[in-house]
Amino acid sequence: MMESLETHADIFGKEASKAIADAAQRFSLSYYEEALRLLSDAEAGGGRLHITGIGKPHHVANYMASLFSSTGTPCYFLDGTEATHGSAGQVKKGDVVMAISYFGNVAELVATVKTLKRNGARIISVTGFPESEIARMGDVHLDVHVEREGDYLNKPPRISMLVSLFMLMNLSVILQARKGIDQEEYLKWHPSGQLGKREKP
């Protein structure tokens, strides 16, 4: 803890960079094969994608619901703490739910996943521990394990959330490309802001 602030920043930068470099090698197309098949089968049967998490993964889930939706894969955020109090009703039989929990044993999310499975949803679990309860309940498990969080406490979820986001962003690129989303389609969903600007004919 006696190191300089510059040293702390340098350590985080190096550990985060290494984690992303490792993730880029791990998260090849074959890594996503089962998840892609599950999503494709669900979509063919009229199923929809939902995403949930509690704590920091809640924010990852909220962002990814927006990103998936804006790039050709409609996705609905599901509050992990509200699901067992009625919000699970947004998920119908045949839908797919991504459940994000790094350690994979958060009691509220475990209860949510159990409820969703009982109601006929398929689960893609995103955790850092394949032996965790949420990982084992998943029809598909996407492993986002990291060695360290990048600081001297090694507790606040920094690198684990960074790698989770990287993995899910990569999946969004694959889904976007598989569906052949072009500029015109993207602009239909994102007409405002700087991204929505286009040259007038």
Task: Give the label of every model feature segment.
Residues 19, 34, 39, 172-173, ...:
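Residue-level detector of solvent-exposed, low-hydrophobicity positions
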Residues 1-45:
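An N-terminal, well-structured beta->alpha segment
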Residues 133-136, 150, 176-201:
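Internal, active-site/partner-interface "lid" segment
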Residues 40, 48-179:
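Glycine-rich phosphate-binding loops that contact phosphosugars or nucleotide phosphates
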